[in-house]
From Swiss-Prot:
GO terms for cellular component: cytosol. [4Fe-4S] cluster 1 binds at C97, C133, C162. It comes from Psychrobacter cryohalolentis (strain ATCC BAA-1226 / DSM 17306 / VKM B-2378 / K5). This is Ribosomal protein uS12 methylthiotransferase RimO. Residues 1-77 are annotated as: Disordered. [4Fe-4S] cluster 2 binds at C236, C240, C243. GO terms for biological process: tRNA modification. InterPro entries: Elp3/MiaA/NifB-like_rSAM, Methylthiotransferase, Methylthiotransferase_CS, Methylthiotransferase_N, Methylthiotransferase_N_sf, NA-bd_OB-fold, Ribosomal_uS12_MeSTrfase_RimO, rSAM. Its cofactor is [4Fe-4S] cluster. It is an enzyme of class 2 (transferase).
Length: 531
């Protein structure tokens, strides 16, 4: 692995810490290059890992291995009577969004509990699992390329994830794959691995139990140890015409609230400082359960978005909400933010502003209503940061429709914006809509949108100069004496950074600092820390 100057997140397992991967290594080696990202903002040429149109959490064989190699440090001392026979090694490639990343974490955790190890490269793996993405056509191609690379470099490959629904397509292109499963088919993946690479025999010492000795309650995480994604539901009840997620992952299925809170508490106990709440439709949480009441810590809790937010707040760590639809009950959650009970950050995929295009998309919102809601939220919580994504060049989009979107952005003054040009996805209803927009027009509109938003972002960040902010340290460059941090306004991977100069040796990754903002660019802040 190449040398790097930044200080890695500590991955050594203590009894109260989850295994995790250093964020530094996240882009050093990818079997399948992340070319399947949607068109990204104009900042990507300068900051290639930020301001993405979607969360992209690609992880490679090498990166996945570092997670469990950290866990081996614990088992070396905690299970000295473990079998001397080498455990089989599984390679892992994880493509796509944070929801898929959580699926990968769960599969790796279960395999590790069964005594498997994670390989550091294709050649050292007894088998490779590829967790695929099928959200847009370029993601499909990236996944197929990753499968092909795994087959050519290893030969024994199991495919899972969203593209697994297209098993015939996968087998037609790659007939050598051993098994294909769909999204969140955890047990099917575990069984397929065990079929082709039998579980290790731990019978030499009956006291050795990898389910107890290897992994703690928090499980293995593919994120740095100070933040983690917490998935609260799967699937979606909406039928947006550009999206095939419901056909890949099904209708909304919410986790009972006690299950969510048990995982959240385990992550806090493991040292996590920030929880990123994710799902396909976060604010619809509990709808399918009819808001069933469960008991947690002796208290009744409804499986309801607002109640969940209240309970998560009581943990006393950062809680960040992603993929929130602007339903009316979100207003009450913003009130919690105004009371300093949640991070004042909302990731809401508005997608467009033209009523005609929103109707063609089958989106459950109207631009005038969303503008009114944004203004109301800022009255309730003046510090609120709003991130959104938009589709440019949707079929039938006219210049008038696009100008409506630009005018809306001027009025809304969003803090963070990602965008991508529309592309066909096999199975999407929008493919059959008339008047598709030429590619050159899509790109020209995309660039105009991002230029406008860049100016808005720069203006908003200039207003931060001279103020103090609490930031969370993600990385440290000891040679330069700079801490790379995030404030409440910055989600990992997709938003900006706060660069803090002249830090001392006592500053650590995962630590909170109170800093003074000295300068700003279009997307990042620059600060000083007095200790």
């Amino acid at each position: 692995m190449p040398n790097i100057s930044t200080e890695s997140v500590n991955t050594t397992i203590a009894p109260s810490q989850p295994a995790s991967i250093p964020k530094d290594t996240a882009t050093l080696f990818n079997p399948a290059k992340p070319t399947a990202m949607p068109a990204q903002s104009s900042t990507d040429s300068v900051q290639p890992y930020h301001h993405k149109a979607n969360h992209n959490q690609n992880r490679s064989v090498e990166q996945s291995s570092e997670v469990v190699s950290a866990a081996s440090a614990k088992t070396t001392t905690a299970t000295t009577n473990a079998p001397v026979n080498a455990a089989p090694k599984i390679g892992f490639v994880s493509l796509g969004c944070p929801k898929a990343l959580v699926d990968s974490e769960r599969i790796i955790t279960e395999l590790s509990r069964d005594g498997y190890q994670v390989a550091s490269d294709y050649e050292g793996a007894d088998l490779v699992v590829v967790n695929t993405c099928g959200f847009i056509e370029s993601a499909v191609q990236e996944s197929l390329d990753a499968i092909g690379e795994a087959i050519s470099k290893n030969g024994k490959v199991i495919v899972t994830g969203c593209l697994g629904k297209e098993a015939d397509k996968i087998r037609e292109m790659h007939p050598a794959v051993l098994a294909v499963t769909g999204a969140h088919a955890y047990d099917d993946v575990i069984r397929a691995v065990a079929l082709h690479v039998p579980k290790p025999d731990c019978g030499l010492d009956a006291s050795y139990d990898p389910k107890i000795d290897l992994i703690n309650e928090a499980g293995i995480k593919l994120t740095p140890s100070h933040y983690a994604y917490l998935k609260i539901s799967e699937g979606c009840n909406h039928r947006c015409t550009f999206c095939i997620i419901p056909s890949l992952r099904g209708d909304l299925v919410s986790r009972p609230i006690d299950s969510v809170m048990n995982e959240a508490l385990a992550l806090k106990k493991a040292g996590v400082k920030e929880l990123l709440i994710i799902s396909q439709d976060t604010s619809a949480y509990g709808l399918d359960l009819k808001y069933k009441t469960s008991f947690w810590n002796g208290m009744p809790l409804k499986s309801k978005f607002y109640d969940l937010c209240q309970a998560l707040n009581d943990l006393g760590i950062w809680v960040r909400l992603h993929y929130v639809y602007p339903y009316p009950h979100v207003d009450k959650v913003v009130e919690l933010m105004g009371e300093k009970k949640l991070l004042p950050y909302l990731d809401i995929p508005f997608q467009h502003a033209s009523h005609r295009i929103l109707k063609a998309m089958k989106r459950p919102a109207h631009s005038e209503n969303t503008l009114a809601r944004i203004h109301a939220w800022r009255e309730i919580c003046p510090d609120i940061v709003i991130r959104s994504t938009f589709v440019v060049g949707f079929p039938g989009e006219t210049e008038e429709d696009f100008q409506c979107l630009l005018d809306w952005l001027v009025e809304a003054r969003l803090d963070r914006v990602g965008a991508f040009t529309y592309s066909e996805v096999e199975g999407a209803v929008a493919n059959d809509l008339p008047n598709h927009v030429p590619e050159d027009v899509k790109q020209e509109r995309y660039e105009r949108l991002m230029t406008l938003q860049q100016d808005i972002s720069a203006q908003k960040l200039q207003e931060k100069i001279g103020k103090t902010l609490m930031v969370l340290v993600d990385e440290i460059d000891r040679e330069e004496g700079v801490a790379i941090c995030r404030s409440y306004a910055d989600a990992p991977e997709i938003d900006g950074h706060v660069y803090v100069d002249d830090i001392d040796a006592h500053v650590k990754v995962g630590q909170f600092l109170t800093v003074t903002i000295d300068d700003a660019s279009e997307y990042d802040l620059f600060a000083s820390y007095k200790g």
